[in-house]
Amino acid sequence: MGKITFYEDRNFQGRCYECSGDCADLQAYFSRCNSVRVESGSWVLYEQPSYKGCQYFLKRGEYSDYRQWMGTSDSIRSCRLVPRHEGSYRMRIYERENCAGQMMEFTEDCPSVRDHFHQKDVLSCNVLDGYWVLYEQPNYQGRQYFLRPGEYRRHSEWGAGTAVLGSFRRAVDNP
């Protein structure tokens, strides 16, 4: 089980709401979110209800300002607890849609896709084991996309507007 507390104001001030599991609509509990305290588990926060919009992956820790989780606004409208995963991590990325063309398999974090894959565009991927977070820019910057195990036949299936992929990492929970 996880525990996350949302605060309307920066530095853990103002009205707060404590959550211990997935919530598709947080609007009834707070009008804005400027800071977050993750006490246990890892979480994906979404800017819109029903797990839509920009995504933000947060591990255990304190985030006194939404910019600390690379947020672009104080809007958080839904959240998911990342299931605990014990075991290996494996993901394959492909240069073409439908898991075709050049393929490369990863089992570790990758701070620069271009350095390993020699391309900046990834049009499809297959998450074989574990949960992963993709980033638009190198060094885990830019828009984030949380991926569960499964086949993503085109970049739009993981929520991306373009096929540009800069980096990715395993969604590993802190001990």
Curated annotation (Swiss-Prot):
Disulfide bridge partners, by residue number: none
Keyword Cytoplasm in annotation: no
Top-level lineage group: Eukaryota
Location of region: Connecting peptide: 84-88
Pfam name, any one: Crystall
UniProt entry tagged with the keyword Repeat: yes
GO molecular function: structural constituent of eye lens
GO biological process terms held by the UniProt record: lens development in camera-type eye; visual perception
Residues of the signal peptide: none
SUPFAM superfamilies: gamma-Crystallin-like
UniProt KW keywords: Eye lens protein, Repeat
Similarity annotation: Belongs to the beta/gamma-crystallin family.
Primary role: Crystallins are the dominant structural components of the vertebrate eye lens.
Description of its domains: Has a two-domain beta-structure, folded into four very similar Greek key motifs.
Protein name: Gamma-crystallin B
